[in-house]
Every structure is written in structure tokens, then in C-alpha cells.
A protein has these predicted regions:
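Conserved structural motif at the start of ABC-family nucleotide-binding domains
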Residues: 5, 20-22
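ABC transporter nucleotide-binding domain
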Residues: 167-255
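ABC-family P-loop ATPase nucleotide-binding domains
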Residues: 83-138
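The feature captures the beta-strand-to-loop junction immediately N-terminal to the Walker
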Residues: 36-38
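Conserved ABC transporter NBD signature motif
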Residues: 58-74
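Helix-to-loop junction immediately C-terminal to a conserved catalytic motif
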Residues: 51
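Catalytic Walker B motif of ABC-type/P-loop ATPase nucleotide-binding domains
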Residues: 151-155, 160
Length: 303
């Protein structure tokens, strides 16, 4: 399948600190991608590189087969909603739509006004007087009405209340289904939001890509296995240990494997997306701490 975003050895450095390093990835078309990771992991940096607002310090990135931001034609194919869902406080809702129509050649005027009507927004209302949820919806409307092939969303629901967040995600799902092959990348800390709308996961931690792939496939490859205390070396061959925890006479491992699962005195448990994400994030955090303490095997994990 054609890659919408493809990066090789991508890196970005700010004042001597690498915000993103050695990032290699390939995101296929037609996916709703959940971009997840801790604060400072490099998620916003990656999105800003993808839309052309930043330029790489190292490596390469191609978006829709071209360099990001490479001319008006390329810009028209990508929509971006930044973290603070920026709108112009002094302009009305209608002003925003007129501005969008003048600056985007593929602008869908009817769809934009229809969406504003469905949301119950007054076209005469100044954006500065809208609620946080309404501003987020307006920003999504502007990005969607330009009919992009790729839509990038940098934590657009972070400051919204549960009802506003639910409404925004519902709108996002509708937008994703309107056109075959459209790709959305949604950055969020709320894993339940990603479970609701995303079918592809991209996990960044420590400024590097740690996990990427279709959600269903990743979940199917990971398990928690619990049994009598033993070392990871006692596990069957072909199991990659993501996380391990030992308490008293019991051991628990989160593993990634396509090999047959252990039988006998092992208990095997399925993971959901939240379990999976947290396992990798905890592993990276604990591995870093353990490295500093010269003990990389005492990892705390879920029971």
C-alpha cells in the first residue's frame, strides 16, 4: 500500500537537544492513525515536520510523495489542526469560512456551511466568544473543508470536556468515512479516544518510534502471561519480552510473539490497546531509570 508519510533517519534538534531522532516510519494511506507518547516524546515535532512548518536537522521525510510544504499544491493536500486549535478571535465564523474559500483551491463551500449548521454555530459569532469545544470544531471544519488527502491533528481535544471531546471525535469519524483513501493522524494522551476512532498505532517514546502497525494486529501479537516465578530466559523461544515483573513466587511478562503460547502452569491474558501502550511506555521509563542504576531487569508492571 502507498505510504502517505515516509521518514528515514528523521531527526530534529532544538538548541542542542534532539526532540526527535532516528525516526524511520511508513504510514499507509486510508488509515486513522493514533499517535501516542509521553510529553516531550516528539509527537508535535513529527506533525510539524510532516506539514512543513519545521525542517529536519537530519534524515528525510516525504508526505504524499513530496517534500512537506513544497509549493501551494502540496499544501492544499494536507490539513493541520495545531494543539491550541488556532482561530482568529476577532473574525466571525463566516469570516473564517470565507477566508478558507479564498486560500484553498479545493474548498467545499457547501460542506463547510452544512457542518457549521449541524454544529449549531452562529456564522455571525466572533471566534473569540466561542467555547473551547466550538473553537475546536471550527478548526476541524476549516481543515476538513479544504478536502485534504492527509489531516494532521495535534491533541485537538486536550482541553475539551468529555461531551465536547465526544462530539469532536464523532465529527472526525464522519470526516474519515467521507472519502476513500483519506488518512488522519490524531495525536492524543487519551488512549480511550484512540481506541474509539483509530485503526493504526504509532507510539513514540524517548524521541524515537517504538511501535507501529495496525491496532488489531498489534493487539493480537501481545499477551500477558503469568505463572510461577522464573526468569525471562525460561520462556519459550520466539517471545520478545516487553515488560516483566516478579513478586514473591509469581512472575508476569508482557510479550510479543507469533509463536505458540506456553501451557501448563502459565495463565495467558489478552491485552487491550491501553494495556499495550502503557507496557511500552513503562518499559522505556523503567529501562532508562534502571540503566542509570545499573539494574535493567527490575521492571514494575501490571498484575
Amino acid at each position: 500500500m502507498t505510504a502517505v508519510i515516509e521518514a528515514h533517519g528523521l531527526g530534529k534538534r532544538y538548541r542542542g537537544r534532539w526532540a526527535l531522532t532516528e525516526c524511520t516510519l511508513s504510514i499507509p494511506a486510508g488509515r486513522v492513525v493514533g499517535l501516542v507518547g509521553p510529553n516531550g516524546a516528539g509527537k508535535s515535532t513529527l506533525l510539524n515536520l510532516a506539514c512543513g512548518q519545521l525542517h529536519p536537522t537530519a534524515g528525510t521525510i516525504r508526505v504524499l510523495g513530496h517534500r512537506p510544504g513544497d509549493g501551494p499544491g502540496q499544501l492544499a493536500r494536507v490539513g493541520f489542526v495545531a494543539q491550541d486549535t488556532p482561530v482568529y478571535a476577532g473574525l466571525s465564523v463566516a469570516d473564517h469560512l470565507r477566508f478558507g474559500a479564498r486560500t484553498n483551491p479545493a474548498w467545499d463551500h457547501e460542506a463547510a456551511y452544512r457542518r457549521i449548521e449541524q454544529l449549531g454555530l452562529d456564522p455571525r459569532q466572533k471566534a473569540g466568544r466561542l467555547s473551547g469545544g466550538q473553537r475546536a470544531q471550527l478548526a476541524l471544519t476549516l481543515a476538513a473543508a479544504k478536502q485534504p488527502e492527509l489531516l494532521l491533528l495535534d491533541e485537538p481535544v486536550a482541553a475539551l470536556d468529555p461531551l465536547a471531546r465526544r462530539s469532536f471525535l464523532h465529527s472526525l469519524t464522519e470526516f474519515a468515512g467521507e472519502r476513500e483513501g483519506r488518512t488522519i493522524v490524531l495525536s492524543s494522551h487519551v488512549i480511550t479516544d484512540l481506541e474509539r476512532v483509530c485503526d493504526y498505532l504509532l507510539l513514540i517514546s524517548g524521541s524515537r518510534v517504538r511501535l507501529a502497525g495496525p491496532c488489531e494486529e498489534l493487539i493480537a501479537e501481545h499477551y500477558r502471561i503469568v505463572g510461577p516465578r522464573r526468569a525471562a530466559s525460561a520462556l519459550p523461544a520466539g517471545m520478545a519480552v516487553v515488560q516483566e515483573n516478579h513478586i514473591d513466587h509469581r512472575s508476569a511478562f508482557i510479550v510479543r510473539t507469533a509463536a505458540p503460547l506456553p501451557k501448563g502452569d502459565w495463565r495467558v491474558e489478552r491485552l487491550d490497546l491501553e494495556d499495550l501502550v502503557l507496557a511500552y511506555l513503562v518499559r522505556d521509563t523503567r529501562s532508562h531509570d534502571s540503566y542509570d542504576a545499573h539494574d535493567s531487569h527490575d521492571l514494575e508492571g501490571p498484575q
